[in-house]
Amino acid sequence: MKVGVPKEIKNNENRVGMTPSGVAELIKRGHTVFVQHTAGEGSGFCDEQYQKAGAQILPAIEDVYREADMIVKVKEPIEPEYPLVRKGQVVFTYFHFACEQELTEAMMKSGAVCIAYETVERDDRTLPLLIPMSEVAGRMATQNGAYYLQKTKGGKGKLMAGVPGVRPARVLVLGGGTVGEAAARIAAGMGAEVTITDVSLPRLKQLAAEMPANVHTLYSSEHNIRQELPTTDVVIGSVLIPGDAAPKLITKDMLSLMEKGTVLVDVAIDQGGCFETSHPTTHSDPVYMVDGIVHYAVANIPGAVPHTSTIALTNATLRYVIALADKGWQQACRDDISLRRGVNMMDGKCTYEAVAKVWGIPYTPLEPRV
């Protein structure tokens, strides 16, 4: 198969869809890999490394899309890429269709096979291609929350760890999944007082047993969240419904419960956000204020640490990329139900029910068509 790795063009997105070592694995299996010129530079990989791995370097993004049967990316195609995606082409990347109607319509119109990293789901409901970036995003969420808690950045002027005789900051983590756990661990390691919420009692029991002593668990309800907000300094939103829009756990009226300078970090923004007042921001302009509350809502948080993120992502995606290249997407999906669950679009049809429901479009089950 001909596999293409274009350069990401989303704002300050420095990750790349595949490392040179991943390319080498595909070449070893007889596939052809096209990498766009300088695609890996932001992650610390030069063209020469890809060439040594066996890739062919192409000068422009148009060339990569034209030559490739399958595109392997990091982030969803953005508007300049829409015309480049063609019927029958496999695009394997993070899509987050549930919060991008224009993208949804464009990919349906293209007739491409869109396989979303974030909805590849095992029988145990784990999301193997979301986990590595969730681990990065959770760690970064706490770091960014601490940074914007500084007075010069609009925050309260508190140190996360405090000092002897001075109370540490209080951090509220909404959602006890991979992002939330990572965020809570980093916050705890920094010395903050941490509360993590979830609706799953077994998950809360697990977190209570495994977390450091300065992390407390709390059942997630509107009442409990409202009770926590007046004394919280940093709120990290990390709730996820696979493939669907994130629930709004903090509404605009709840901002009045918080002290001015409280920092909200919405990691769920790529699924629409879990704060009513959230809207997507970028690494070049990451924060804004609403009623004196700092909002950080960058949709590609791991893009700020691209070397780590790219390696972690390739470690997770490579086995699926190999299966798709070796077998073709249809056979690969027949053989692996987790990969089949990742197919969101095909031949102009929406094959993922949650996305179809969000946008009110017809849902076409994939199984009879694979």
Which residues are covered by each model-predicted region?
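Generic hydrophobic/aromatic pocket-lining and core-packing "Φ" positions
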Residues: 23, 47, 104, 142, ...
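An N-terminal-biased, well-structured beta-alpha scaffold segment characteristic
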Residues: 2-106, 110
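Rossmann-like adenosine-cofactor binding region
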Residues: 209-291
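Adenosine-phosphate binding glycine-rich loop
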Residues: 118-159, 269, 274-370
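Glycine-rich phosphate/diphosphate-binding loop of Rossmann-like nucleotide-binding domains
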Residues: 6-42, 152-237, 287
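Glycine/serine-rich phosphate-binding loop and adjoining beta1-alpha1 elements at the start
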Residues: 2, 8, 77-169, 298-300
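Short glycine-/small-residue-rich Rossmann-like dinucleotide-binding loops
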Residues: 69, 75-76, 95-96, 221, ...
